[in-house]
């Protein structure tokens, strides 16, 4: 869609959308409740735009939105189906069932982004927020945290007291403002993609320099959080970014930096211990137990599943036979397996369709030069890596962080990576005249 064909937008609506997106960006580093409120507001604004027939979406974005809505609808209905088929004995907890909103959050971000996106504001909020969070994480890593936040924030102080070092030389788990090392580290993977895209693709040296600091801060935060899967995902995403965005000396320099990070991990006693435990965790440990129970649920209810949000009670029903405990029963420690266990083959196919359509739309925009799409595509790669060993939607702040990045990757005016746009095809929304302003 050419930008000249866009209808005039109410300035008040532009301000509302800018406020929602900025609030969402703040939540990426601050608190889960912030991203939940922002995502809910985005869904509401998207519904208003659709009701007013004001949405103008590219065909591939429209397909992604439709797939997201279809998956959300099935998630909403699946507990009732599970009750009717006898696969479940009760309705899921409201907090877990309410996470259906997260499924359409990325689509909502893409929809409201058609009104306009304050790119520099969002970039400044995310970059500044992550630099501050990195500093806080460094302090948490070295000093046993003593200040207890108000109960209203529902932050678990004990998560910051996990010592991965020794009594003589303690190394505590960084949790940033989330006070939770996995929320902190997995959220970093969501935002790492855009930072790498700016670092490798921006034409302005100052922006590349700032993006470089943010990338180093995120890598340091993941290192200090002792998050093994997140570190592996960060390395993979960084290598993909180097292959996509830079060549020659720049690529070699990037590989050297990653090599130094790997060396630091190897020489760290705390990290060596963490990596040694990872092997036992996958082969015969807690993660293998959780996955085996997930597969058992799939075998028992392959088509419709046990109902969205019902993995825990269904898994606990096997406790006497499998030995699963309350902590491990929450999910199958794998996104795809948990989706299959909860929503059956129907939900799995819808979930796969949604991600394939998202990836296709992002790849097309990356090839046409969209900076935001490139960052979102890298973020999508990180999500898929983490999804192999974690059920990321369990932490809404993590899932909604990815959703915001993906939605923005489908929006207009995201800038270009290369100096010129291919002339063989019409200008897409993401690289139209507004993108160069």
Model feature map: region roles:
Residues 8, 20-25, 39-42, 72, ...:
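Alpha-helical transmembrane segments of multi-pass inner-membrane proteins
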Residues 271-272, 277-292, 304-343:
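Long extracytoplasmic/lumenal interhelical loops at the membrane interface
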Residues 176, 219, 292-295, 301, ...:
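A conserved mid-to-late transmembrane alpha helix and its immediate loop/hinge
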Residues 73, 135, 139, 225, ...:
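A membrane-periplasm/extracellular boundary helix in multi-pass inner-membrane enzymes
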Residues 16-24, 71, 214-216, 330, ...:
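Loop-to-helix entry and N-terminal half of a specific, functionally important transmembrane alpha helix
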Residues 26, 46-55, 79-143, 385:
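Transmembrane alpha-helical segments and their membrane-water interfaces
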Residues 18, 41-47, 238, 258, ...:
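Transmembrane alpha-helices of multi-pass inner-membrane enzymes
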Residues 208, 250, 343-382:
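Hydrophobic transmembrane alpha-helices and their immediate junctions
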